[in-house]
Amino acid sequence: MPLVSVIVPAWNVAEFIPAAIASVLAQSFTDFELVIVNDGSPDTKALEAAIAPFRNRTDTHYLVQENRGPSGARNAGILHARGRYVAFLDADDEWEPTYLEQQLARFSDDESLDLVYCNSRLTGDSVLAGRTYMDTTPSTGPVTLEALITLTCNVPTTCAVARRQAVVSAGLFDPQIRRCEDFDLWLRMSAQGSRFAYHRAVLAIRRLHPDSAAADGVRMFESQLVVYRKLQSLLGASHQAAPLVGHQIRRAEADLSLERSKQLLMAGQYPEAAEALAAARRFYKSRKLALASIGLRAAPGLVRRMYAGRAVR
């Protein structure tokens, strides 16, 4: 049996997946299997042509299913996997050659760990290209449930290797969640007692797209709210982390209102933008938002020009 199962979900990624697969096959650590999951991709013909050079390898498995989203695709890979560990790689990302070797070394150093993640270099069509993930989304201190809830520690899926049994015991990825589905799983794993650790070695390359899920603020915060409310129900009111979850729900509601306000402002729907901004101000008490609120009522066109493409918080 392989020690590691590398799971690569594929949906509309024929252009990028050869580089992702090549980065797996170039690993210095070789005791792995590769599981590619075609998640009902509309570019299946091109996808299968792209992966054809790799299909005849005994360590490579290709699964095809109807579209179930990233959670359903990763779950199919996990359930097919034979490795003690699962490593997740998005099909448009890549790993450095020592990725698996260095990640697994952390498990050898501390056998109580259930998940290890590292840093990555950002690339693609984004203002963040050239920076590292931990430059923009830091992890600070121990990876506790509280640190995950408050986003003090942030786990990127492409940079994570986990014990397969810990993932299965937590209930796998939730197929009903198509954004922040990884965040949801990490929270559930931590809540059940799984131990996480990170290191800052830059071992992955993450490709950013302007039309990616993370680029849509409204949908991202909507998904965050779904995840936090799910965790609130899971933990119950008596859990020591319950107040933190409640605070994060209020914060995410305010962030969602703020994103909606910006969208409505740019669409010229000024009264609705002012109403959404007022909702955000019930959490955020900044002077800048207070001035923006006054401006939206007195001179909305001017505010629109001033805040086009800028964060108002």
Residue ranges and their predicted role:
Residues 1-222:
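Nucleotide-sugar donor-binding/catalytic module of glycosyltransferases
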Residues 196, 208-313:
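C-terminal subregions of glycosyltransferases and related glycan-biosynthesis enzymes
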